Amino acid sequence: MTAIRYEFIKTCKQTGARLGRVHTPHGSFDTPTFMPVGTLATVKTMSPEELKAMDSGIILSNTYHLWLRPGHEIIREAGGLHKFMNWDRAILTDSGGFQVFSLSDFRRIEEEGVHFRNHLNGDKLFLSPEKAMEIQNALGSDIMMAFDECPPFPATFEYMKKSVERTSRWAERCLKAHERPQDQGLFGIVQGGEYEELRRQSAKDLVSMDFPGYAVGGLSVGEPKDIMNRVLEFTTPLLPDNKPRYLMGVGSPDSLIDGAIRGIDMFDCVLPTRIARNGTCMTSEGRLVVKNAKFARDFGPLDPNCDCYTCKNYSRAYIRHLMKCDETFGIRLTSYHNLHFLLNLMEQVRQAIREDRLGDFREEFFEQYGFNKPNAKNF
């Protein structure tokens, strides 16, 4: 019995997007879905109860950061990550690979793994496929990610080819080192940059290993959105229909819709809480920076079309005041709103798939949000 099971429900006749449900040891969630990111075993400023009120069925935590603080052994002693953070729904943990390649100034890649420096204190560390599995097995997440190399954009074909081959070998080692396949599902990560030939090779390698789910990695690392969409168009069809598909590190509203249209089931990103901390809010009418002076006497909600806790109870003027005074409650209110906005957006996407009208929904949303305007601002 596998720990993770994907249930296909239907395909949107207008776009080919798919509606489904992922079953995990800690409950099920409908897809396509957005996963709030709780890097250090907390979604910044949010309580588990608030996330449940938004109907979040799965969140993401970070293997690299939890390995450094408080340490995976402490979390194991606490009974696993679910008990440690009082979250009884699904958790996905990444492998730590992205942080190793993005946060460390010094790193040396070899076949065994990666030597790098702790970004907190400069200590020398080593992370391998086996170590990434050991940490994630201790954390006890429902979905684990294989340890991979995530090259930046752009990278040469020659470098990316070697990287893909190494990532495939590391994926095989992850499968062998994974100690709890009946309790935790391990996803493989398809790499290959913008190169179709390499994406095909990576997908072929990983699909032959029969992971319970697959991620598309190496996107949202600086490439233009048209390249990301093109890569998804030739990569997603290479993945099994009966397994979940996860696009890593993507969370802008337009990319969530475009990813779903291209067959993606799961997304994650720090974007909604990161931009909330500087007062940037997602609304049904586009991007709103609540710190702006024009909102000082605006006593309406952040988004008149939103029914979240923030919008039902507090005004733009009040939230602006809190943000200008560096009050934590202001960050809580904007974070709550942004997370609710994306989770609600995904429910609208699922409903549009049910009604076979996701293409129409995309056009309506892009027009209302302002993505169709020349030089439209993104996040």
From Swiss-Prot:
GO terms for molecular function: metal ion binding; tRNA-guanosine(34) queuine transglycosylase activity. GO terms for biological process: queuosine biosynthetic process; tRNA wobble guanine modification; tRNA-guanine transglycosylation. The keyword tRNA processing applies. Substrate binds at residues 94-98, 148, 191, 218. Its EC number is 2.4.2.29. InterPro entries: ArchSynthase1/Queuine_TRR (IPR050076), TGT (IPR004803), TGT-like_sf (IPR036511), tRNA_ribo_trans-like (IPR002616). HAMAP family: Q_tRNA_Tgt. This is Queuine tRNA-ribosyltransferase.
